[in-house]
C-alpha cells in the first residue's frame, strides 16, 4: 500500500505501528525519525525499521505515509521540523490522545500540507512503554478514532481509514471536540483517579503496610497508574478543559455518595 513509510517516535505506539505494517505487508521501506540514536539502533535491532535518522526532514523525505507518535506537547515542534521534507502527496497522520490541540498545532506547522493531515487516535496501549514493547497485534480489533476537519482532503481521509482497516482496527470518525470530551470521561479521568489514589496512599506514613494488604480490587483499579507519567502529564495539560469538566462531574458524584453515607 505504501512504498516508503516514515514513523516519527518509536515507542510503544510507533513501534507497534511499524510492526503491524510489516506483518500485513503494507510498507516497502520503513524509516524512523527520533531524537535518540539509541532508539533508532534499537528499532533496527528489533527489525521494526530499515533506516533511521535524527534529522526529521530527512527521515520523511520521499515517504508517502508519515505517522507521528510523539508526546502531544512536542507535536508542533516535531511537525515544524519534518514539514520541509514532506512530499506533496504524503499522507500524514498521528497517534495523539488529544485531538483539538494536535489539530491546532498541525495547522500552524504544516501550512498548505495541513489538508493531507488526518488526525487519529488508536484506542490501544499497554502499561509498558518503549519500542521493546512493540506488538504487531496491538491495534487488531481495537478502535481507532479519526477526526478529520472541514479542511481535510477527502482522498487523504479515505486513505487514512483504509490504512487502519488494513491493520485490523475498527475505524470510527468523530468531531475533534467530541473526541476530547468522550476520552476525558472514559480514559483521561480514570487515569487521573488511579494516579491520585496511589499518590495519596503513598504519602501516608504507613504506606508500605497499606500496599502490602491491597487485594485484587485495588490492583485492578490502580493498574493504569503504572502508565508513562510524562505522556499523561501532556494529555492532562493539553485536554485540560475537558478533563476539568469530567473531574467536576466526578467530584459531584463523590459528594453525593459522601452525603448518602453520612445520612
Where are these regions (language model features)?
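NAD(P)+-binding Rossmann beta1-loop-alpha1 motif at the extreme N-terminus of oxidoreductases
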Residues: 1-63
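Residues at the starts of beta-strands that form the adenosine-phosphate
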Residues: 4, 29, 116, 143, ...
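Rossmann-like NAD(P)-binding element
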Residues: 56-91
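Glycine-rich, N-terminal phosphate-binding loop of Rossmann-like dinucleotide-binding domains
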Residues: 69-71, 96, 148
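Rossmann-like NAD(P)(H) cofactor-binding subdomain of soluble oxidoreductases
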Residues: 81-132
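Internal alpha-helical scaffold of NAD(P)-dependent oxidoreductase catalytic cores
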Residues: 136-223
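Interdomain hinge/lid region at the active-site interface
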Residues: 207-263
Amino acid at each position: 500500500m505504501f512504498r516508503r513509510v516514515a514513523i516519527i517516535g518509536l515507542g510503544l505506539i510507533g513501534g507497534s505501528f511499524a510492526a503491524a505494517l510489516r506483518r500485513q505487508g503494507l510498507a516497502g521501506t520503513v524509516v524512523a525519525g527520533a531524537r535518540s540514536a539509541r532508539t533508532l539502533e534499537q528499532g533496527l535491532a528489533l527489525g521494526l525499521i530499515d533506516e533511521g535518522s535524527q534529522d526529521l526532514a530527512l527521515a520523511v523525505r520521499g515517504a508517502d505515509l508519515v505517522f507521528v507518535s510523539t508526546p502531544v506537547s512536542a507535536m508542533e515542534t516535531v511537525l515544524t521540523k519534518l514539514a520541509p521534507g514532506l512530499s506533496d502527496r504524503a499522507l500524514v497522520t498521528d497517534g495523539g490522545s488529544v485531538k483539538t490541540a494536535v489539530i491546532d498545532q498541525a495547522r500552524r506547522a504544516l501550512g498548505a500540507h495541513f489538508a493531507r493531515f488526518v488526525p487519529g487516535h488508536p484506542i490501544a496501549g499497554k502499561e509498558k512503554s518503549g519500542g521493546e514493547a512493540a506488538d504487531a497485534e496491538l491495534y487488531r480489533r481495537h478502535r481507532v478514532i479519526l477526526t478529520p476537519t472541514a479542511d481535510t482532503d477527502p482522498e487523504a481521509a479515505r486513505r487514512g481509514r483504509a490504512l487502519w482497516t488494513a491493520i485490523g482496527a475498527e475505524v470510527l470518525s468523530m468531531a475533534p471536540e467530541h473526541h476530547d470530551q468522550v476520552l476525558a470521561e472514559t480514559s483521561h479521568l480514570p487515569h487521573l483517579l488511579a494516579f491520585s489514589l496511589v499518590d495519596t496512599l503513598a504519602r501516608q506514613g504507613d504506606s508500605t503496610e497499606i500496599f502490602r494488604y491491597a487485594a485484587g480490587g485495588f490492583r485492578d483499579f490502580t493498574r493504569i497508574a503504572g502508565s508513562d507519567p510524562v505522556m499523561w502529564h501532556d494529555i492532562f495539560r493539553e485536554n485540560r478543559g475537558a478533563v476539568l469538566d469530567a473531574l467536576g462531574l466526578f467530584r459531584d458524584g463523590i459528594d453525593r455518595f459522601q452525603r448518602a453515607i453520612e445520612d
